[in-house]
Amino acid sequence: MLRIGRELLPFDAASHTIGVHNIATLTAQCAKEAGLPVDVPLVSAAALCHDIGKFGCRGADAKRIPYLHYYYTWQWLSGHGMEHIAHISANHSTWDLEFENLPVESLLLIYADFRVRGTREGGRETVRIYSLAEAYAMILS
């Protein structure tokens, strides 16, 4: 579905998702090795599903993908009996929440999503992994 989406949609969900998955899973494994109580398989599953809601934004909602895909991600995952994954996936870019109230798995996914960004060049999106300093500069500019 992600590869088909690359052809049909203006964003490259496949490359972004793979990048986020790699960063999130590696960071989760490192955190677990450092002694933090991290559910690495949960981080992996949530990273793979975090933008699935973008495919649910149709009609008038298509213009509001950045705002609504969290809701559609939650709806799809919870509707398929994956509430635990839905909770992590749907909170992957919530700047207005109190971070101390989020599970570590959500924080790792937020970090990974923050680092993997796309830029538009020649009508196509190019996805890359940015350094933390570069990611901050992009967000704050």
What is each model feature region?
Residues R6-E7, E33-L140:
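Divalent metal-dependent catalytic cores for phosphoryl transfer on phosphate-bearing substrates
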Residues M1-P10:
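Generic N-terminal amphipathic, Lys/Arg-enriched alpha-helix
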